């Protein structure tokens, strides 16, 4: 491998000749040989956006000239497109402020910009990082990445699953089945009503995420090192938020209090709480579906789900609810990530949180897993659900909880006696009620209509 020599304030470093990073990135590679978790590409993309926005803001305020702006913008466009992803090698387990990742971006954009300009025009600190600090750029990149990931990737997946549930609600209108509470038989419910509960869970948690996005669209940029805005020209914070908005097509604003924006990660904790709520709901939905599909002969068997692959290496013909299992594992991981995000966010000592890389790593993993998991769950399972009407009707009419319909006519205590007798003697509710003398056959038939109990 060929190398070139790069310098920083600590001296010279050998850097691979074909890489755009420089001395500080190389030092990080040598000092933090920990794990294989590369800084998320969503963060690299966000850095491309914020560095381009910062250059535009600095240009508007007369801090850089046209030539520098042009070179920076062109280099940033390559970062944004992902063309330069191979030049961002740093792991998550680095300085807690993300300083090395910020310098990685500064060095790559400067060296690529100089190559584009055909001369040594740009300096990583003096030009690419002008009016900025790692302490305000990394939190800004976190928010940009979080917003784009949720709005561009997660919301479309949620919307498709909601649409599928709406279709299933309509297709299954009029089908009445036994409800269940405590894993025990309960009063009747229509299959459409049950599905509507699943659908509304997704609608509610999407609404929670939309509320969380309000805080995530506030940017720390302009606070520099400790929130005071040292070395930042007047109007920079507002200008850079405007430029980020233009580049993303999303309305970002500058954070009202930069001291809070640097040391607290409230917005990410709040948003991840909504992701956790979504995961909890998906866990419940996937569990309901696999319970309802259990069988084929010894389970509930009230719905059919797609048969996607063989389920056992030893039991021929077995088919398992694999998409439900995958979805529930995703939910477990997201719920676990919430603990890491919350704990890391509590470590904002004095003017800066220094657990930011692990916060955004877990946050973006949660969004990615949920977006992909929901799409797979929808496409390979939920969209193919069909009702086993015969089994639903059989279970409904065998349910002892239908006795609840008799409460207004024979009273709670007599209804309980009827249910206990039917269960003990393995006879129908009708037979038990008549045998106990509470109603005649004609009276029973007149008042007992399970399909009307919903």
Predicted regions span which residues?
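Conserved, well-structured ligand/cofactor-binding cores
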Residues: 1-454
